[in-house]
């Protein structure tokens, strides 16, 4: 089937946006726009997350965007939703099903900042969203919700280790602060030093107070 320039068609809910009929173009889903927006957010900042910038980066016309999103604000909400689902909800569900041993789960949680390129990329996205949150209420609300959810999950781990409710919350806050610090201060220390810090925090967090 021939497609005219600057024309889009819909195949089973997926938009095909074609600028040049000379060659095939990529099928775009809403998630493709969300991922592209996240990349621009990390590399250039929130002010550059615009429909024209994303369309140019994806090699499509702006019309494809409006098949999936009502506005730029709608896209930004989806970016925050995707980030929250990937980094908080799916993570806690995955860890919850990985082991019933709270000691093993604690080791898994503490090791999260060191899990290769995927962890590094997740940290870059999170730092970009936190920078965005300093000037945008919607982003700040998403960050606050994610922080509260993660700290709450950590507190459940410490409760399972036998600590009282108040102490479990305090330890959860300290552990989460360490995890955030490892992302922010990722250039501090070589891999061996980072492992040493991680092992120290693991021992410290499981040690009862005198």
Residue ranges and their predicted role:
Residues 1-28, 209-210:
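N-terminal intrinsically disordered/low-complexity leader segments
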Residues 81-88:
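Short, basic, alpha-helical segments at the C-terminal edge of helix-turn-helix-like DNA-binding modules
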Residues 32, 36-44, 90-94, 129, ...:
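Solvent-exposed, amphipathic alpha-helical segments
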């Amino acid at each position: 089937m021939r497609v005219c320039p600057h024309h889009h068609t819909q195949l089973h809910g997926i938009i095909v946006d074609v600028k040049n009929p000379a060659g095939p173009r990529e099928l775009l889903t809403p998630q493709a726009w969300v991922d592209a927006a996240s990349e621009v957010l990390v590399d250039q900042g929130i002010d550059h997350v615009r429909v024209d910038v994303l369309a140019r980066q994806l090699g499509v016309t702006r019309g494809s965007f409006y098949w999936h999103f009502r506005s730029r604000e709608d896209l930004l909400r989806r970016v925050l939703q995707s980030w929250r689902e990937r980094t908080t909800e799916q993570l806690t569900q995955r860890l919850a099903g990985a082991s019933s041993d709270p000691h093993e789960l604690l080791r898994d949680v503490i090791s999260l900042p060191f899990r290769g390129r995927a962890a590094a990329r997740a940290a870059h996205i999170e730092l970009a969203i936190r920078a965005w949150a300093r000037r945008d209420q919607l982003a700040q609300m998403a960050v606050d919700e994610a922080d509260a959810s993660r700290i709450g999950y950590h507190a459940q781990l410490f409760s399972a280790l036998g600590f009282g409710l108040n102490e479990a919350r305090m330890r959860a806050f300290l552990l989460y602060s360490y995890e955030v610090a490892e992302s922010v201060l990722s250039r501090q220390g070589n891999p061996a030093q980072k492992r040493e810090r991680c092992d120290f925090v693991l021992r410290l967090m499981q040690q009862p107070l005198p």
